[in-house]
Amino acid sequence: MYKDRSGGGIMGGGGSSRSEILGGAIDRKRINDALDKHLKKSSPSTSRVFTSKDKDSVPSTSTAKSQLHSRSPDVESDTDSEGSDVSGSEGDDTSWISWFCNLRGNEFFCEVDEDYIQDDFNLCGLSGQVPYYDYALDLILDVESSNGDMFTEEQHEMVESAAEMLYGLIHVRYILTTKGMAAMMEKYKNYDFGRCPRVFCCGQSCLPVGQSDIPRSSTVKIYCPKCEDIYYPRSKYQGNIDGAYFGTTFPHLFLMAYGNMKPQKPAQNYVPKIFGFKVHNKQ
């Protein structure tokens, strides 16, 4: 399972560098374009887009994972530095969930408990929203399969993007639970979601929020509990994440659950002046 997450072991002689591998793995625009194309062709109510005949042509999720990291990127990743795109442990036994949450740009995501994902009740209704649902779920849970056929490039991209979409839709539910909020609390305390850019909020820690609960409607924003306004994330990588993976409810329910974490509103507002005189505000 993801034996090549550390950047080697699948390529044989000379494996690609970690940044090169991830440059291809997180090329969301290319992958999402492929998924959009597929969603237009298929019925949105279909939970599994393969017939029994089609299933024989699709390999196991473990094969998909190997190809995900062994495939060379079409273009170089757009990075600000030459540092690694992944933080934390990169051992061979890293789960897909840990690997995904540690990708550059995915810092807003917390790790969803596998027990939560394995409970069918928590996934109610998602099979009709995500194409290749069963394969995407197997990929997330690192489930091995005896099917040894190979993905086509298009099928590989579909399952890869479907797994990201499915995890996001599970994530938005999980962060409304007690365990999910506790995980997000740690990130909030560590300023993982960023600080409010407003001067008079004095670097207030923010929370992720979506402007819509419908997937692919808008990207994630950050909500400042002090000035109660929303802003674009500072990182362009985080700015590409679907806002539906965090939803419109989370920050407000979070602050109700942790009332002691809600800051007082700023006492000062900026006042425009010209040569020291306040500018008259015409109504």
Swiss-Prot record:
Free-text description of this protein's post-translational modifications in UniProt: Phosphorylated by alpha subunit.
Keyword Magnesium: no
Biased composition (Polar residues): 58-70
Compartments it resides in: Cytoplasm, Cytosol
A molecular function (GO) term: protein kinase regulator activity
Key words of the record: Cytoplasm, Phosphoprotein
GO BP term (any one): positive regulation of circadian rhythm
Task performed by this protein: Plays a complex role in regulating the basal catalytic activity of the alpha subunit. The tetrameric holoenzyme CK2, composed of two alpha and two beta subunits, phosphorylates the transcription factor PIF1 after an exposure to light, resulting in a proteasome-dependent degradation of PIF1 and promotion of photomorphogenesis. CK2 phosphorylates translation initiation factors. May participate in the regulation of the initiation of translation.
Family note: Belongs to the casein kinase 2 subunit beta family.
Name the record gives this protein: Putative casein kinase II subunit beta-4
